[in-house]
Amino acid sequence: MSDILSSLAYLTGKPVASAKIKAQPEHFQVREDLGFAFTGEGEHLLVRIRKTGENTSFVANELAKACGVKSKDVSWAGLKDRHAVTEQWLSVHLPKGETPDFSAFLAQHPSIEILATDRHNKKLRPGDLVGNEFVVTLSEVTDVADVEQRLEKVKQVGVPNYFGSQRFGNDGNNLEEASRWGRENVRTRNQNKRSMYLSAARSWIFNRIVSARLENGVFDKFIDGDVAQTASGTQLVDASNMAALQAQFAQGEVAITAALAGDNALPTQADALTLEQPFLDEEPDLMALIRGNRMRHDRRDIALKPQDLAWTVDGNNITMTFSLDAGSFATSIVRELVIEEKVEREY
């Protein structure tokens, strides 16, 4: 994983095995699940694509050209990895109801396939998905037995719900820029950059808080003043309800949360506030950016438990299948299993 994550704690200790990740695009497959049906009519053409070795923005721009529209008229629910084989929907604003001839587009881009088209009355917006299904192959694993033991642990309790290195840009550039923007009070109309840098800022503070809970032995334990996520909303933890909430946590019915920092005060109290607040105070530049853009405080589960996790072993290769809710990172699961070996990619 990226060096920016190297300081963060592991649930079961730093992995002893190494492996190659994404040695081939087919070793990291992602299938998007929007979780809702289309209306079958409307101003927006929905195009389901499968791309290999391409990023979402590039495909969207090329699709816009093929449809004779501007790039801003093509949108998506989530960005997908470049070094992978991924399936997702893109929406194109074509209010006249036309369906373009994509034959030239497909001939020009053999790494892109169109799997289906449909119509909908709304465009796709970031976050308009329930999750993603993954097929991930770890190749040339140096200690298969250790990885399988770790997989059993992940299946039972999950992993730290860290934001992956993708959130912070190449070599952490997004985080560095977020700090600079906060320090220099930068103002911009570039919504994409502002969104990226704000996300990096909040994600980094969250990651540090989660790491601290691991280091302090309270990753799977409520402490006084925590904010629990329940089926009906959030609940402040104190002596009167801690035992009951801990029992519900053991059954997977409630979750422990950590801060996604905002310009308002943390809702945590007592011991939980003592744990979280220093990480906001230690990042004055990031907090200046967050407050300057009036981001409101939010919470995020500190544990990530993959759904339907299964795996097969073929020699020194391990192939995993699992599903994750939107906003979770498959790389955070891989990080708990192996140390990533450098791959010289030709794609």
From Swiss-Prot:
<dbReference type="GO" id="GO:0031119">
    <property type="term" value="P:tRNA pseudouridine synthesis"/>
</dbReference>
<dbReference type="InterPro" id="IPR042214">
    <property type="entry name" value="TruD_catalytic"/>
</dbReference>
<keyword id="KW-0819">tRNA processing</keyword>
<dbReference type="InterPro" id="IPR020103">
    <property type="entry name" value="PsdUridine_synth_cat_dom_sf"/>
</dbReference>
<dbReference type="GO" id="GO:0003723">
    <property type="term" value="F:RNA binding"/>
</dbReference>
<dbReference type="Pfam" id="PF01142">
    <property type="entry name" value="TruD"/>
</dbReference>
<keyword id="KW-0413">Isomerase</keyword>
<protein>
    <recommendedName>
        <fullName>tRNA pseudouridine synthase D</fullName>
        <ecNumber>5.4.99.27</ecNumber>
    </recommendedName>
</protein>
<dbReference type="GO" id="GO:0005829">
    <property type="term" value="C:cytosol"/>
</dbReference>
<comment type="similarity">
    <text>Belongs to the pseudouridine synthase TruD family.</text>
</comment>
<dbReference type="InterPro" id="IPR001656">
    <property type="entry name" value="PsdUridine_synth_TruD"/>
</dbReference>
<dbReference type="InterPro" id="IPR011760">
    <property type="entry name" value="PsdUridine_synth_TruD_insert"/>
</dbReference>
<dbReference type="InterPro" id="IPR020119">
    <property type="entry name" value="PsdUridine_synth_TruD_CS"/>
</dbReference>
<feature type="domain" description="TRUD">
    <location>
        <begin position="158"/>
        <end position="305"/>
    </location>
</feature>
<dbReference type="InterPro" id="IPR043165">
    <property type="entry name" value="TruD_insert_sf"/>
</dbReference>
<comment type="function">
    <text>Responsible for synthesis of pseudouridine from uracil-13 in transfer RNAs.</text>
</comment>
<feature type="active site" description="Nucleophile">
    <location>
        <position position="81"/>
    </location>
</feature>
<dbReference type="InterPro" id="IPR050170">
    <property type="entry name" value="TruD_pseudoU_synthase"/>
</dbReference>
<dbReference type="GO" id="GO:0160150">
    <property type="term" value="F:tRNA pseudouridine(13) synthase activity"/>
</dbReference>
